[in-house]
């Protein structure tokens, strides 16, 4: 028992609970945040909400040589870890995790669309902004459900990929001109791209998921 790595899982959302169960099945000694001082590894949530997770307090309590992992880490979090003498790694920087994480994000978005729309997704005209992992996962699933999907993306290679998958594609600079053709718009770009000019050109009653 003493030879097993101790992992403190911080946070209680479904993902942290699932991670804790998987680690326990793999043979690690898993505990909650109250055992941070004894942990070899500290598993922080994704995203790391520093307003809810007392990061400085947690890491100051960690033992020397402890290793912490978190997702979407801010510069402030990295500095707190440095001051506490704890090595901190961002697991969301791993490309494969971003791809896998896009799947539940896309499914959650489709769930919102099904709840909020008064008509089927089959036959709908949906504009997807961005074609990173989330945009890709979402667009192909919407197309499989029978929606007409147009991808608006900045990079030419993203638009080429969208077209190779049987989707329509356009540059972001064409967004304002495209807007009137759609009753559903989903922004997967982590930045505000739907300005007042674009919003004014959308159909009345359009559904926007941002």
List each language-model region with its residue ranges.
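Rossmann-like adenosine-cofactor binding region
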Residues: 47-67, 165-209
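Glycine/serine-rich phosphate-binding loop and adjoining beta1-alpha1 elements at the start
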Residues: 2, 43-123
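NAD(P)-binding Rossmann-fold cofactor-contacting core
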Residues: 26-35, 145-165
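Residues in the short beta-alpha loop(s) of Rossmann-like NAD(P)-binding domains
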Residues: 13, 74, 154-155
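Glycine-rich adenosine-cofactor-binding loop
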Residues: 8-18, 23, 122-143
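Hydrophobic anchor at the start of a short beta-strand
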Residues: 7, 29-30, 88, 149, ...
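Short, structured coil segments at secondary-structure junctions
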Residues: 25-26, 64, 83-86, 145, ...
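Alpha-helical segments flanking ligand/cofactor-binding loops in enzyme cores
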Residues: 21, 59-60, 79, 140, ...
